[in-house]
Regions:
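Catalytic-core signature of thiol
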Residues: 1-170
Length: 170
C-alpha cells in the first residue's frame, strides 16, 4: 500500500494553498515531475507550512490514462459497467486513481459508513454537473454494500482534509 503525503504536495508545490486549493491537472504535473514523500515522513497538518526540502521524495506518480466521465452521467448500464470495471482494473494494476466530484454540505459533514447522496453530487435541480467539480481525492479501492438491494459497489476514497474527516480521512 502506498500512502503519499498530501502535506508534502501542499507545502512544496507553489501552485496550491489550503484556502484556494489548485487544479487537478497542475498538481498531477507537479507529482509527475517531483514525486512526493510517504505520509509517515511528512504528515498532514492542513496548514500552508513552508516546504521541508530535506524530506526524500521516493514516491513517483505515473500518468497512464484519463477516464471519461460521460458513462457515469448518462447512466447507460453497459457503458457504466465497463467504466467501473476499467477503474477497478486501474486500481489493481497501477494503484490510486484521481477522482473529482462536486462537494456538497452533506459530503463535508460525512463521518462514517457508506456515503450516498443521490441529490447534489452529480445533479442539482435536474441539471447535470458533469463539468463542475470542486474537489479531487484519491480513489484507493472499492467494496460491495450487501445491505442494499440490489447490492451496490462503493468506492473507497482518501480525502486530503486530514484524519478528522470521515473515517480517519477515508
Amino acid at each position: 500500500r502506498v500512502d503519499g503525503s498530501e502535506q508534502h504536495t501542499l507545502s512544496c508545490y507553489r501552485g496550491i494553498s489550503c484556502g484556494l486549493g489548485s487544479h487537478v491537472s497542475s498538481v498531477a504535473q507537479h507529482l509527475l515531475k517531483e514525486g512526493t514523500s510517504p505520509e509517515h515522513l511528512y504528515p498532514y497538518t492542513g496548514r500552508d507550512d513552508p516546504c521541508n526540502q530535506k524530506t526524500p521524495t521516493p514516491i513517483d506518480a505515473v500518468a497512464w490514462s484519463y477516464a471519461n466521465e460521460w458513462p457515469l452521467i448518462f447512466n447507460d448500464p453497459w457503458h457504466h459497467s465497463r467504466f467501473v470495471a476499467g477503474i477497478k482494473a486501474a486500481l489493481c494494476q497501477h494503484g490510486p486513481v484521481t477522482a473529482s466530484m462536486w462537494v456538497t454540505p452533506a459530503f463535508r459533514a460525512y463521518s462514517n459508513g457508506i456515503f450516498n447522496e443521490n441529490n447534489g453530487v452529480f445533479a442539482t435541480n435536474g441539471a447535470l454537473r458533469h463539468s463542475q467539480t470542486n474537489h479531487a481525492m484519491a480513489l484507493v479501492g472499492w467494496g460491495l454494500d450487501k445491505s442494499s438491494r440490489p447490492w451496490r459497489t462503493y468506492w473507497i476514497v482518501k480525502n486530503s482534509w486530514g484524519t478528522d474527516w470521515g473515517e480517519s480521512g477515508f
